Amino acid sequence: LCLRIIKDHLEYTRLKKNYRLLDTFDQQYLVFRNIYKFRTISGIEHVMPKGGAWKWAQAICEFSNNLTEEVVDIDAMLSDPDMEISTIAKVVNTYQTMLDEENLIDFSAIQTECYRLLTEHKDILEDLRNSIKYIMVDEYQDTNYIQEQIIFLLGNHENICVVGDDDQGLYRFRGATIRNILEFPSK
């Protein structure tokens, strides 16, 4: 859904025509190929795991995915007095700059770009809301924070039906939380 919304409103995104979608391996390989760009970041050795460039690439992707999916303000992190926090923000900024320069988007960025599009362009959000009568989400226990926010934006907190089993949360590694389904009735 998010990718379709982006495609339909591409001119309002950071992407240009003919952008390329990265899967998990492509994302990590992109970072691996460009690891030299990260090695120059002051203090990076304090936030990276021991090991070679592939381990670093994996950690960089995890930082970016986790912060993106939680809609964390990277600019606020950059000015944080804690050196580790500001270093991680520099790492994520460097990665996001690479995506922009090469006209790429990864799975987490799809969600963030869609969320940004919906929150910054109220006319697009209203058009989408008017075209959607009901939202049904299966496996709701596997949604993450940003996915839930997009669902609530599109549904305007109305006519949303979710189905899931809090004993079957499988995507915690992608930021999914069973808290979404447990707290859904109160939202």
For each predicted feature, which ranges?
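Short gly/ser/thr-rich secondary-structure transition/capping motifs
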Residues: 115-119, 145
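Conserved RecA-like helicase ATPase core segment
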Residues: 145-187
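Walker B catalytic acidic pair
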Residues: 131, 139, 165
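A basic/glycine-biased coupling hinge at the interface between accessory DNA-binding modules
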Residues: 1-113, 122, 130, 158, ...
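Short basic/glycine-enriched coil/helix segment immediately N-terminal to the Walker B
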Residues: 118-134, 155
